[in-house]
Amino acid sequence: MATRRQPLIPGWLIPGVSATTLVVAVALAAFLALWWNAPQDDWVAVWQDSYLWHVVRFSFWQAFLSALLSVIPAIFLARALYRRRFPGRLALLRLCAMTLILPVLVAVFGILSVYGRQGWLATLCQSLGLEWTFSPYGLQGILLAHVFFNLPMASRLLLQALENIPGEQRQLAAQLGMRSWHFFRFVEWPWLRRQIPPVAALIFMLCFASFATVLSLGGGPQATTIELAIYQALSYDYDPARAAMLALLQMVCCLGLVLLSQRLSKAIAPGTTLLQGWRDPDDRLHSRICDTVLIVLALLLLLPPLLAVIVDGVNRQLPEVLAQPVLWQALWTSLRIALAAGVLCVVLTMMLLWSSRELRARQKMLAGQVLEMSGMLILAMPGIVLATGFFLLLNNTIGLPQSADGIVIFTNALMAIPYALKVLENPMRDITARYSMLCQSLGIEGWSRLKVVELRALKRPLAQALAFACVLSIGDFGVVALFGNDDFRTLPFYLYQQIGSYRSQDGAVTALILLLLCFLLFTVIEKLPGRNVKTD
């Protein structure tokens, strides 16, 4: 009896292998382009370049300070948010989650409107007869912006750790009379200390690879990071060899940070409890006052820049700016790039998770982890590094395109894969545990299973991943900074041009439109599954 020929690669493995091959091939092509353009015989002079080492030191120093100033206050803010229930708490938690995907230039514009020399606080001090001496440029401005972005995210992640503490532990501590420092040390700290290192490593990595923030608020050669030096080498000096060398250095640093972050990131098992969310009824006055002060300070950090964008955007230039065709051209460019990049990101992520899930089901854990890690690999090549590789590759072959839609879409999709993986990874595993045996018994597999099971059960996580990817793409400035021109510009690129030419009122309108577009796009995509889908 003739036996049926077995395929070289099982069908369930093809999606993951294809996505992994694509991601690795792109990363390898960018790396080779950087390597070929890097100065091969001038490395000794490079290592002796004092300015280069100043840039490297500043990159690490500002990232370290940003992580420190974000994580330490987040510990106390997370405790306050856990203990207090107040109107608007859910909205505040949602805002904490949104700051990570808020367009950087919008936040920078709001920060300048509040803390700048002509900002709200300067005007208030002037009316009180005081002198406003704070400058939002340089290291202090970079730290302020990074804390604005990362303190809410750190608070949200640490709050999850506090919510995992079994209610029985809290109840027992209350019965034993544990209060304040002793309660923090023996009950909360064992859970927080497992979450703090990976959170700090993540924030350090994000701040180390920060580009738009440093470009806008750097304030000169003394406050320059490696990514900004890459941009300057290509855009101002046009020194591809130096840009390639800096990009390789940045890639090595980021790869080390990614590996460190992955090593520190250990899943925290939720506590088994029958008293979820139990809180000590013995609530002291000074504790309530301290928590209220912390929450008010957090609101004063987050809300004024966002309110400034809205208030400053509604100015007398609004009708004139809205009548400019270039604004709507930039909006349409941003929208089509964001939607295309979001869809491509979700498709590639599902391909990786599909094959990874099948490998894990067959007890091939290491192979499954390798597939998932290939999606995280792109974190080792920040957008500006990947864009530099594409820039040099195209410049040395077919030439730079007039319109870089495809490059920007593809790069933004790759940069969003790690975030989409985090959104879809656990729901995908839950579905496997729930429906895998049923699908096997019914013979449902492949495309049929995807259509009947995954696409139905994953409606909400898929919409959330798509929303995150689209908003991350629409607010990106790092990639388009190299390829943008008068014929190809997105809203962030157009806003940067307005800020650079001191058209602050026009820029305020553009920042408001970009903020509203991100909010509407995120809300609409998140609502796509419909009201009947259960939400957290």
UniProtKB/Swiss-Prot annotation:
Subcellular localization, as worded in the UniProt entry: Cell inner membrane
Domain ABC transmembrane type-1 positions: 56-261, 331-525
Pfam family, one: BPD_transp_1
Topology in membrane: Multi-pass membrane protein
Regulation of its activity: Transport is inhibited by the sulfhydryl-specific modifier N-ethylmaleimide.
A single Gene Ontology CC term: membrane
One Gene Ontology term of the molecular function aspect: thiamine transmembrane transporter activity
InterPro entries: MetI-like, MetI-like_sf, ThiP_ABC_transpt
Binding partners and assembly: The complex is composed of two ATP-binding proteins (ThiQ), two transmembrane proteins (ThiP) and a solute-binding protein (ThiB).
Protein name from the UniProt record: Thiamine transport system permease protein ThiP
Source organism: Escherichia coli (strain K12)
